A protein has these predicted regions:
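Single conserved hydrophobic/aromatic residue that forms the stacking wall/gate
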Residues: 1-14
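Eukaryotic intrinsically disordered, low-complexity, charge-rich
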Residues: 13-70
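Alpha-helical scaffold segments that form or flank carboxylate-/histidine-based iron centers
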Residues: 40, 69, 111-118, 140-157, ...
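Conserved alpha-helical segments that form or flank metal/cofactor-binding pockets of metalloenzymes
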Residues: 53, 57-90, 152-176
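Conserved oxyanion/phosphate-binding beta-strand-loop segments in alpha/beta enzyme cores
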Residues: 72-101, 115-123
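A short glycine/small-residue-enriched secondary-structure motif
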Residues: 93-107, 126-138
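Acidic/His metal-coordination segments adjacent to aromatic residues that form catalytic metal sites
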Residues: 96-120, 178-198
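Long, hydrophobic, well-ordered secondary-structure blocks that form the structural core
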Residues: 128-189
Length: 198
C-alpha cells in the first residue's frame, strides 16, 4: 500500500495511475509531470562511408532483424490472468505491521508491490529507448548506427509490452522511483556517447 510522503511533496498515492478508473481530469502540474523535457549536449555524426567496418555488429544487426517479435501478435493478451489467492512467503512476513494486516490487505499490498515493480521496469525501458535513440546519432560508424536503431526498435517493443500489461492487467502505474530517475537523468544528459553503451 503506498506510503504518504512528509512535507510539501505530493503523496505517492495521489500519483498512482489506476487504469480501472475513468480517465481523470489532469491538472496543469500533472500534465507537466507526464511530459518532462531533458537537455543534452550530445554531438551527432554523419558517416558517409557505408561499408561494413565490424562484422560482429553487422551480425548482431542481421540477427535482430531475423528474430523480430510483435507485441500485438506474439503475446496472447486475451489469455486470462491467473491471480493466486495464496499469499507467498516473503522476507517481510515477520515485520510486525505486515503481520497485523488481514489476508485481504496483504493481497492488496502485494498487488501494489507488483505494480510498482512493473512500473519501474516500464520507466527503465523508456530510458533504454531514449538512450538507444541517442546512440543512433552519436555512433561513429554506419553499422553501429544501424544496430543502435534496431536496439531502439527493440526497446520500443519493451515499452509497448510493459505499457499494455500495466494498462490491461495490473491496472496500476506508479511514478518513476527517485533512484531510477536519477540514474536515467545522469545517462541521458551525459554528452559522452560511449558511456551510454555500458
Amino acid at each position: 500500500i503506498p506510503l504518504r510522503l512528509v512535507g510539501s511533496e505530493m503523496c505517492i498515492r495521489d500519483r498512482i495511475r489506476d487504469y480501472a478508473e475513468v480517465e481523470p481530469e489532469l491538472s496543469p502540474k500533472e500534465v507537466e509531470d507526464i511530459a518532462e523535457i531533458f537537455k543534452t549536449s550530445l554531438t551527432g555524426t554523419f558517416n558517409w562511408d557505408y561499408s561494413v567496418q565490424d562484422n560482429r555488429i553487422a551480425k548482431l544487426y542481421e540477427l535482430g532483424k531475423k528474430l523480430n517479435w510483435n507485441v500485438s501478435m506474439d503475446i496472447d493478451w486475451d489469455r486470462p490472468l491467473v491471480v493466486s489467492e495464496e499469499i507467498p512467503v516473503m522476507f517481510w512476513d515477520e515485520y510486525p505491521p505486515y503481520k497485523k494486516l488481514s489476508d485481504e490487505k496483504k493481497r492488496e499490498f502485494l498487488r501494489h508491490r507488483g505494480a510498482s515493480q512493473f512500473s519501474q521496469f516500464l520507466h527503465g525501458e523508456q530510458g533504454a529507448l531514449l538512450v538507444a535513440s541517442q546512440l543512433v546519432s552519436c555512433a561513429p560508424t554506419y553499422q553501429a548506427k544501424l544496430y543502435a536503431a534496431s536496439q531502439a526498435f527493440d526497446e520500443a517493443r519493451h515499452v509497448e509490452a510493459f505499457t499494455k500489461y500495466i494498462q490491461n492487467r495490473s491496472k496500476l502505474m506508479y511514478p518513476v522511483g527517485s533512484g531510477l530517475k536519477s540514474l536515467l537523468d545522469k545517462i541521458l544528459t551525459d554528452g559522452r556517447w560511449d558511456l551510454k553503451l555500458i
